[in-house]
Structures are given as structure tokens and as C-alpha cells.
Amino acid sequence: MIAAVDVRKTFGDVTALDGVSVAVPAGTVHGLLGHNGAGKTTLVNVLTTLFVPTAGSATVAGLDVVRDAAQVRRRIGVTGQFASVDEDLTGTQNLVLLGRLLGASRREASQRAAELLELFGLAEAADRPAQGYSGGMRRRLDLASGLVGRPDVVFLDEPTTGLDPESRLGMWDVVRTLVAGGTTVLLTTQYLDEADRLADTITVLSQGQVVAAGTAAELKSRVGRRTVSATLAAVNIGPALDTLRRAGLDPLQSGRTLTAPVESSRALAVVVRALDDAGIEADELGLHEPTLDDVYLTLTGARP
């Protein structure tokens, strides 16, 4: 549904994208992860026909973003980092206006507006001016605006930036609803948990280049294994070290906590059984997976 091949974009002497390739199957969420200036928004602008690539090629819904730009625009919806709604108009008026501009009859536009306001939990505020909406409500109205034309592909450029936790969770639910209905979503974000929760596949950008791509699980597997940890009740951890080594583990000590890399989640049961057989009491036991934080720090040396 979305394909970028060796896309390069320069602005004078500045290279914003340097040979970026991305492939997004239909009906999935693809996350673009990267710090400010990594090239996320520039790539979105190329894919949405706002920028012409300096080199390389890209298609959206099978249409070339340069040759078929007008057709691409009719197949996509775009939501930026900041809500772009007319604050003097009501929620309904904003959506009806867009529907009419897209060629719908007044009846069709009104019906579509009502559907979207209900979907985004804005029905009760439909007749209120948007200037009275909260930040989360404006962002939802902005996303609804991008769906008036029933797009096949939706680009969400950092849609939850600046939102409170509750509003972020609400936006996540909306994205899941879109994908369940068959919409393809490309999501740019600086929030690692957002990419982990929503994206089927992820591309990590740094300085305009792709440094990694794959599912969250695949990316995590590249930077380290699972670990088990045991925080002991006793200060003397010598016996516990010996016990875990005899169980085939290679524990490291930090205070009263022992940590060991493991291949399988079943190792937690091995640790519990070994400590119990030795009569060693643990205050806390845990199994820890690598996180996207670990992935990003390993790949780029910085946090997004």
C-alpha cells in the first residue's frame, strides 16, 4: 500500500533523507521512529506529495507520488502534529465543510460528519465551536477531518504530541479502530511505547537514514536477550550466586539483586525452583524483555 525506494531529499546542502526505503502492507500500522530532525516528517511530506523527492521513488495505493500526485491526495488522509481545524466553526461545521469541498452533497457530508463525530466520541460536542474543545478533542476532530473522504491510507505525524495520557490512550483506540476497518496507517512518533503498542512494523530513522526495520519483537531481539532478576532478602548473596551458577545461569550482582541473561521465559521457573530448593528467600523475582528504549539507544546512541 505504501512503498518508498531509495528516497533522497535535499534542501541545498542539507540532506534530510538519504536513501530511505519503507514498505507498508495494506491494513497495517507502520511506525516511523526517530528523534527530532531524523527525517520522519520529511518522509511523510514526500509520501503525501508535499515534497518532490530529489531521488528515488515512492508509491501510495499503487500511485506514484510525483506523476499521480492529484490522485494520491484523493486516496489519503493526513493529520499533523498540531490540530488544524477552524476554531470558529462547530465540530459538525468543520467536517461538513470538508465534505462539501471534496464534492459530497450536503446530505452526504452531514451524514459522514455525524458518523465521524460518533466514532471519535465528539457527538455531544458536535454543535459547540471548536475553540471550546480541549487539546485532545481538537486532535480527534483533526483526525476525523482527515477521514471525511474515506481514505485508504492515513498519515499520522506525531498525533499525540502534547496530549495528556488519557487523550493519548483515546487516540490509540481510534487508530486500532481504523486498522480494524481496513485502513493503512503510517504513524510517526517519538514515543517508544506508542510504537510498541500500535505498530505492526517499525522503521527507525537517524540522520535521514534507516538504521533498523522490522517488528518490535525483531528489533528487540537485535539488542539483547531476556533477563531474570532476583532481589534477595538476605545481604549475603554468595550462596545464591553459587545456586544459580549450578542451575546453568551466569548471574551478575548489583547490591542484593542478581541478574542473568536467559533464552526462554521458562528460566524464571528454574530460578524459583533453584532458590527454593536451596532455602534462599527472594523479596522480588522478575523476567525482563528488551524494550524499544534499549533498541533506540543501541542503534542511535540517543533517546528520541
Language model features with spans:
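ABC transporter nucleotide-binding domains
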Residues: 2-4, 9-206, 212
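Short phosphate-engaging motifs
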Residues: 16, 194, 236-239, 267, ...
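Structured loop/turn residues at secondary-structure junctions
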Residues: 125, 135, 233-235, 263, ...
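ABC transporter nucleotide-binding domain
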Residues: 171-262
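C-terminal coupling/interaction segments
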Residues: 263-304
